[in-house]
Amino acid sequence: MDLSLSTRTVGDRTVVEVGGEIDVYTAPKLREQLVELVNDGSFHLVVDMEGVDFLDSTGLGVLVGGLKRVRAHEGSLRLVCNQERILKIFRITGLTKVFPIHTSVEEAVAATD
């Protein structure tokens, strides 16, 4: 399966809608998108993972890398996810303590840092 990405601006946040599989083959596409956004001055990102069907360790690494990039600019990276199979990966790896995870884009956009 492939990876789909789209971006939109909501207030001062950039929302990245992700769909499909984030794995060793598709993660570089997500990494490029996050790097490009940060390089263009978007330091407050919301990654909407509601359309993600699969996530592996490569995908987790890309998200952690994105978080480091935005934090270097006093920014934030928030996730939106309600899917138990994806949330389980974040719990098992302890990344629920690293990433703020929200139930909706609206909630993530409204959250303050």
Swiss-Prot record:
| InterPro entries, A to Z | Anti-sigma_ant (IPR003658), STAS_dom (IPR002645), STAS_dom_sf (IPR036513)
Asked if DNA-binding is a keyword of the record, the answer is: no
Protease among keywords: no
Which residues are in the STAS domain? 3-112
Give the superkingdom in one word.
Answer: Bacteria
**Which keywords belong to this entry?**
Phosphoprotein
Gene3D superfamilies from the entry? STAS domain
Tell me how the protein is altered or processed after translation: Phosphorylated by RsbW on a serine residue.
Q: Name one GO molecular function term.
A: anti-sigma factor antagonist activity
Q: According to the UniProt record, list the residues that bear Phosphoserine.
A: 57
Q: Which Pfam families match?
A: STAS
Function comment: Positive regulator of sigma-B activity. Non-phosphorylated RsbV binds to RsbW, preventing its association with sigma-B. When phosphorylated, releases RsbW, which is then free to complex with and inactivate sigma-B.
Family, per entry: Belongs to the anti-sigma-factor antagonist family.
Listed PANTHER family = ANTI-SIGMA FACTOR ANTAGONIST TM_1081-RELATED, ANTI-SIGMA FACTOR ANTAGONIST TM_1081-RELATED-RELATED
Please state what the protein is called: Anti-sigma-B factor antagonist
> Which organism does this record belong to?
Streptomyces coelicolor (strain ATCC BAA-471 / A3(2) / M145)
